[in-house]
Regions:
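Conserved alpha-helix/loop element of class I SAM-dependent methyltransferases that forms part
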Residues: 32-54
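Conserved class I S-adenosyl-L-methionine
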Residues: 54-63, 79
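Conserved SAM/SAH-binding beta-strand->alpha-helix loop
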Residues: 84
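S-adenosyl-L-methionine
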Residues: 93-135
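Conserved Class I S-adenosyl-L-methionine
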Residues: 107, 183, 188-224
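A short acidic, Gly/Pro-enriched loop at the edge of an enzyme's catalytic core
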Residues: 132-147
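A short glycine-rich, Lys/Arg-flanked "PGG" loop and its adjoining helix->strand segment in the class I
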Residues: 160-172
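Conserved beta-strand signature within the Rossmann-like core of class I S-adenosyl-L-methionine
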Residues: 174-181
């Protein structure tokens, strides 16, 4: 994966995406307000009432960690994994300090430095972070009762392989949430490895259909939805995307 996600600019952008409040993220009365609070909405795709008492959760592609902390509200143990060393170092700093220093860029080199706190009700003591590859997860991480796999597939060289490995790290009855806007780019995934967005034998291949064909061997599809999200670049420029989302339950046999 390119070093794009190791730069200070991207780390700060993701800190704002994960931890800035509503007013800090979108300081306008107009705009896509439904796209705010993505990480909270993502974690809420997990039905906490169906988890075992001592549940383990994996936030695969955790970036700087917000979903991991949201999962800690109802999971006894949460592991966040990301390929970016910079993201994981930043997430660990937040874990240990409880503080999030970030810059709200306004224009050019102008911006406002602020320090936010972790949201109320999360349990940092339940959370840990690990640098790792979604395509080559270590056996030592064990199995999980809940997994969020968000906005990562279209940044992997071999997304099919990553999906196929999920069955090996989930307990029977485990819940899995997979979401992606499917922004396939050559710098991350060559055309031959993509899940969709092309024609094969004259027929359109859609990424969601490929995900279903891969996962249905070991999981049951429970629901699909669209999760919008908004990334602030600066005060007057934002990235708006819609992640196609599917919720799954691991088969018990």
């Amino acid at each position: 994966m390119p070093d794009f996600y190791e730069t200070d600019v991207q780390i700060n952008e993701y800190l704002v995406f994960h931890y800035a409040n509503i007013e800090q993220t979108l300081p306008w009365k107009f705009g896509p307000h439904q796209a705010l609070g993505f990480h909270t909405r993502l974690a809420e795709c997990i039905d906490s009432s169906q988890l075992p008492e001592k549940s383990r959760a994996l936030d695969l592609g955790c970036a700087v960690g917000r979903t991991s902390f949201e999962l800690s509200r109802f999971c006894s143990e949460v592991l966040g994994i990301d390929f970016s060393h910079g993201f994981i170092d930043t997430a660990n700093n937040i874990l240990h300090s409880g503080e999030i220093p970030l810059v709200l860029k306004r224009e050019g080199q102008l911006g406002d430095a602020v320090t936010n706190k972790l949201p109320e009700g999360v349990h940092p003591e339940r959370v840990s972070f690990l640098q790792g590859d979604a395509e080559a997860l270590p056996d030592s991480i064990g199995r999980f009762d809940a997994i969020t796999f968000a906005n990562v597939l279209d940044r992997l060289p071999h997304p099919r392989h990553a999906l196929e490995k999920l069955a090996e790290i989930t307990n029977p009855g485990a819940q899995l949430v997979v979401c992606s806007p499917f922004t396939w780019l050559d710098e991350f995934t060559i055309a031959e490895e993509r899940l969709g967005g092309f024609k094969q034998n004259g027929e359109e291949v859609i990424s969601h259909d490929s995900i279903v064909s891969i996962l249905e061997k070991h999981f049951t599809l429970k629901a699909t939805c669209d999760l919008p999200f908004l990334i602030r670049e600066h005060e007057r420029k934002f990235k708006f995307a819609i992640a196609q989302t599917s919720v799954w339950t691991r088969l018990t046999s």
